Amino acid sequence: MKIGSKEFNIGERTYIMGILNFTPDSFSDGGKFNDIDVAVKHVKEMIDNGADIIDVGGESTRPGYEIVSEEEEISRVVPIIKAIKEDFDIPVSIDTYKAKVAEQAIEAGANLINDIWGFKKDKDMAKVAAKYNVPCCLMHNRDNTEYKNLMEDILNDLKECINIAKDAGVKDENIILDPGIGFGKTYEQNLEAMNNLERIKELGYPILLGTSRKSMIGLALNLPVEERIEGTVATTVIGIMKDACDFVRVHDVLENSRAAKMTDIIVRR
């Protein structure tokens, strides 16, 4: 799979996506990297620590988050994407579910669309992905937590996302799937999904796992956001062991990169 100018050999190793929230209210690091110079320094740190992709977000998706306008989101993400691309040769992902934001981000240099609604919120998203021929990550999400059979329902929901993408002209080789840990699921459902991650492989696409510092970890370990590094690392290792983690999206790049590398050495020989 090619993302930007970089080739990603799926199955060879686990790739690290470093999170850069350019927002004032993200659940984990809101407001921390709101200044472009500070953000660029953090990007360099993530790259030095093993990041293969930088995921830029301009709207928090934490529970109860405030929806921002397309214009506001564009004004947040475009300058930082341009700054990253100017200073570093690394693929950039745009974390958005809005087509206009995605298009402006790609024009600014973004190489991948990461949509927490799997192209279901804004149907023009698939058209943008097809138009620019960029890879896209389709995440499982729901407005509710009512499932008849959790894993079967997740697979069926993801199939719908895939069909939306392909009907718009997105190429098969440009699709990545995300089981959506922490979205549209209860604590118990998140644990069940984690324990059955290998089922996502049945759909035949690369998988991105995003569990970093999430409430599932906080509830399990009774820890605040800033103390969830070890719990996140555990989920990264589990994902790799289940052969269901080609990309891992994390805040704490160094710790997860090292854990992923060690796990890869053991299981991907």
Curated annotation (Swiss-Prot):
Residues 14-261 form the Pterin-binding domain. It catalyses: (7,8-dihydropterin-6-yl)methyl diphosphate + 4-aminobenzoate = 7,8-dihydropteroate + diphosphate. Keywords: Folate biosynthesis, Magnesium, Metal-binding, Transferase. The keyword Transferase applies. GO terms for cellular component: cytosol. GO terms for biological process: folic acid biosynthetic process; tetrahydrofolate biosynthetic process. Its EC number is 2.5.1.15. It comes from the Bacteria. InterPro entries: DHP_synth-like, DHP_synth_dom, Dihydropteroate_synth-like_sf, Pterin-binding_dom. (7,8-dihydropterin-6-yl)methyl diphosphate binds at residues 61, 95, 114, 178, 214, 249-251. GO terms for molecular function: dihydropteroate synthase activity; metal ion binding. Gene3D superfamilies: Dihydropteroate synthase-like. Pathway: Cofactor biosynthesis; tetrahydrofolate biosynthesis; 7,8-dihydrofolate from 2-amino-4-hydroxy-6-hydroxymethyl-7,8-dihydropteridine diphosphate and 4-aminobenzoate: step 1/2. It is an enzyme of class 2 (transferase). Its cofactor is Mg(2+). Belongs to the DHPS family. This is Dihydropteroate synthase. It comes from Clostridium beijerinckii (strain ATCC 51743 / NCIMB 8052). The lineage of its organism: Bacteria, Bacillati, Bacillota, Clostridia, Eubacteriales.
